[in-house]
């Protein structure tokens, strides 16, 4: 009946918004008042907003981790959605475990860090009550939810999470094993990372980025955003963390190791903070003109500068 979400970034606000939209009591915590203000704005004004009805945001109570973490004792499900960093997640769970009430369930929204690494050395009381609930972005639009148990996760916890997420939140729950990047990201991130590398070769050969996005979208059964637009939605910072996670966990000889680092020009974007929609600019950005209209610009990886984005017709493609 109630959900505490810890982490007010893209995924945390998405999860909190979905729960609020379905009329559940929600607590959303982040590291600072400034972060909470950004989370509030993201819930109402994000692209897309986390709630369809702005009034539903009234179901959310906001607070900071330092001041309000003890409030989790009042909530049935505690969902961690902080940065994709193992030490950060472990430190949070160490603080969280003594505060939650008996009978509550816990989950981590990690997109690929094995649960066994997160819970190593933690109390058995936590290990039996925790699972991975891997939502996909944007949370309210993506039906897929991966649910992953640890070695000691109670069947009752798995059943409770599966029932709530499937019936109350309307997700299609896929049960996966506790392996690196699980199922969706093990396939999808390999596609995206290899795509960035091969697309960079095409860009260097003079192929427009819009043509690459047009081809690597609906014709391949993929989102209409295309490759670059999809990564703008996910965030280059997330892609970089996924690559680092793969570097640690993939076995020697795995083909994925050839593509885990971002191509040079794209890594420079990451260093500048040009990481995607949540930063206001990634491969694409929206510019407001003097007459109030908007135009889409694309960051040309060949020239290293912004230019107007051109609509590419697939009929114009050449072999």
List where the protein language model places each region.
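N-terminal glycine-rich phosphate-binding loop for ADP-containing cofactors
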Residues: 1-319
């Amino acid at each position: 009946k109630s959900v505490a979400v810890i982490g007010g970034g893209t995924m945390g606000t998405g999860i909190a918004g979905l729960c609020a939209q379905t009329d559940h009591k929600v607590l959303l915590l982040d590291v600072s008042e400034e972060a909470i203000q950004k989370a509030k704005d993201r819930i109402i004004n994000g692209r897309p907003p986390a709630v369809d009805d702005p009034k539903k945001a009234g179901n959310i109570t906001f607070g900071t981790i330092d001041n309000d973490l003890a409030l989790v004792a009042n909530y049935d499900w505690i969902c961690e959605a902080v940065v994709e960093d193992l030490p950060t997640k472990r430190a949070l769970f160490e603080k969280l475990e003594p505060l939650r009430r008996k009978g509550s369930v816990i989950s981590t929204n990690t997109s690929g860090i094995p649960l066994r690494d997160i819970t190593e050395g933690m109390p058995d009381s936590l290990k039996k009550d925790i699972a991975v609930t891997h939502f996909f972005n944007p949370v309210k639009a993506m039906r897929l939810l991966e649910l992953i148990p640890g070695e000691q996760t109670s069947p009752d916890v798995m059943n409770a999470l599966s029932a709530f997420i499937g019936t109350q939140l309307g997700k299609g729950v896929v049960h996966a094993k506790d392996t690196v990047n699980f199922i969706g990201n093990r396939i999808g991130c390999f596609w995206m990372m290899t795509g960035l590398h091969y697309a960079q070769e095409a860009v260097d050969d003079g192929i427009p980025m819009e043509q690459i996005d047009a081809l690597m979208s609906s014709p391949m059964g993929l989102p209409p955003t295309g490759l670059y637009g999809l990564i703008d939605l996910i965030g280059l910072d997330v892609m970089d963390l996924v690559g680092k996670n793969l570097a640690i966990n993939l076995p020697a000889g795995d083909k994925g190791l050839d593509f885990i680092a971002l191509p040079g020009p794209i890594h420079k974007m990451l260093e500048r903070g040009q990481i995607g929609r949540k930063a206001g600019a990634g491969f694409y950005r929206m510019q407001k003109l003097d007459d109030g209209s908007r135009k889409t610009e694309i960051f040309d990886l060949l020239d290293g500068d912004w230019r107007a984005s051109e609509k590419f017709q697939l009929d114009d493609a050449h072999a």
